[in-house]
């Protein structure tokens, strides 16, 4: 962890010694807990959604979703450092479905790639009629076997 100030990092990532960092899977898990009201508790999840739902920057995932589903509600956090671009989002679509997206790109065009990736993801979710739904019965990253079932 590190404050956004000139002071040094107080707790660095144990793998790469980063002061700010999360894998796409960690980001997806965060949004899963947020959507299910288990990010601390239901009240904290609702407050966090309120904070994440007002993106003032329309790039990366938001830019792509504005083209495919401009009425979607997007809870997101993005970041850019040099040529590294990251975005993570919980997307609630106008048809009532929702999905989680998380991606990192290391290229000067990474922001454009993320806009294109989310367009394709949104199209896949939107065309999922008739496909069996997959349900995870435990929280990703928790201890124990992950149980995945289709249906419902």
What is the predicted role of each segment?
Residues 7-15:
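Flexible glycine/proline-enriched surface loops and loop-helix/loop-strand junctions
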Residues 16-152:
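Structured C-terminal helix/loop/strand segments within mature extracytoplasmic catalytic/sensor domains
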Residues 1-6:
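Short, charged, amphipathic alpha-helices and their helix-cap/turn boundaries
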């Amino acid at each position: 962890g590190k404050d956004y100030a000139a002071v040094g990092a107080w707790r660095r990532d144990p793998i790469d010694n980063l002061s700010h960092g999360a894998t796409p899977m960690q980001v997806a898990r965060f949004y899963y807990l947020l959507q299910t009201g288990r990010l601390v508790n239901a009240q904290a999840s609702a407050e966090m959604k309120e904070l994440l739902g007002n993106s003032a920057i329309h790039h990366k995932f938001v830019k792509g979703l504005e083209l495919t589903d401009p009425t979607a509600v997007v809870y997101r956090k993005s970041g850019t450092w040099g040529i590294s671009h990251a975005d993570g989002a919980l997307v609630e679509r106008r048809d009532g479905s929702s999905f989680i997206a998380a991606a990192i790109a290391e290229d000067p065009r990474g922001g454009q790639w993320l806009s294109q990736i989310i367009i394709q993801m949104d199209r896949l979710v939107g065309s999922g009629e008739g496909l069996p739904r997959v349900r995870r019965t435990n929280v990703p990253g928790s201890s124990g076997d992950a149980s995945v079932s289709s249906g419902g």
